[in-house]
């Protein structure tokens, strides 16, 4: 898989995580080029944000995203950390 696609997926996931952590006060903006790359290649990411999501191209699973959470509460909640993205080649 191309590195452009991998970077676009990571950018979108980081934006979702920042939005989940900080809500309306999040300062991370997803690049429109990342959204365009995913749309032009028919890449879809499920939107559960619980434990794991899947990445699909035309209905075929190409990878999964496993989310990690902080061990201790910060500001009354467990923050989401950087995800682990594994691709099936």
Regions found by a protein language model. Give the residues of each.
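Charge-rich, solvent-exposed alpha-helical interaction surfaces
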Residues: 4, 8-12, 16, 33, ...
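Acidic, low-complexity, intrinsically disordered interaction modules
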Residues: 19-85
